[in-house]
Design a protein with these regions (language model features):
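Bacterial N-terminal signal peptides that target proteins for export
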Residues: 1-9
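Hydrophobic helical h-region of N-terminal Sec-dependent signal peptides
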Residues: 10-14
Length: 182
């Protein structure tokens, strides 16, 4: 039987491991347990495996997640403003109502992702891929879509694109267009 003190130590160790960016934490009853927390994080977590994590409401602004794997993660209402996501994988992730304001997401992959009502104002999506992503009511105000592939994005409207910019390499659904970035 563990004493209250030992339980407190185990809990503290799990929290410290989660804050240090560990993907797994020790669980006293065997096997590793996945920690699904929504902490505040500001730092560098390049090439981290956060696939399948529950990060709803996480505060991760001003951070560097370049090359990280967020596939199948739940990031609803997460705040990742002013963060770096170059080459990150958000395939099949749920970013509903997430804040990606001024985020840098060049070459990020959003295949099958849910981005409904996400705010990506001022974000850089240069060469990002949005195959089968749901971008219904996503805010692209002042976003850079140069070279991005949105051909199969669902819910994309001309009104959204009127607030963004792109270039001749930007791929859009038939009938939609985007103004050139200066």
């Amino acid at each position: 039987m563990l004493t209250h003190f030992r339980w407190a130590l185990l809990g503290a160790a799990a929290i410290i491991a989660a804050q240090a960016g560990q993907a797994r934490a020790f669980w006293p009853f065997g096997n590793d347990a996945r920690l699904d927390l929504a902490p505040a994080y500001g730092g560098v977590c390049e090439d981290c495996d956060l696939s399948g994590r529950i990060l709803a409401g996480a505060r991760m602004s001003n951070s560097d997640f370049s090359g990280s794997d967020f596939s199948n993660a739940v990031l609803t209402r997460a705040d990742a403003s002013h963060s770096e996501f170059e080459g990150a994988d958000f395939s099949h992730a749920d970013l509903t109502r997430a804040r990606l304001i001024d985020a840098s997401c060049p070459r990020a992959r959003f295949e099958g992702a849910r981005l409904e009502r996400a705010d990506a104002s001022g974000a850089d999506f240069t060469r990002a891929i949005f195959h089968d992503a749901d971008v219904t009511q996503m805010k692209f105000d002042d976003a850079n879509l140069s070279g991005a592939d949105l051909r199969n994005a669902r819910g994309l409207t001309q009104m959204q694109l009127d607030e963004a910019c792109g270039d001749r390499r930007t791929r859009l659904p038939r009938g939609l267009r985007v103004q050139r970035c200066d």
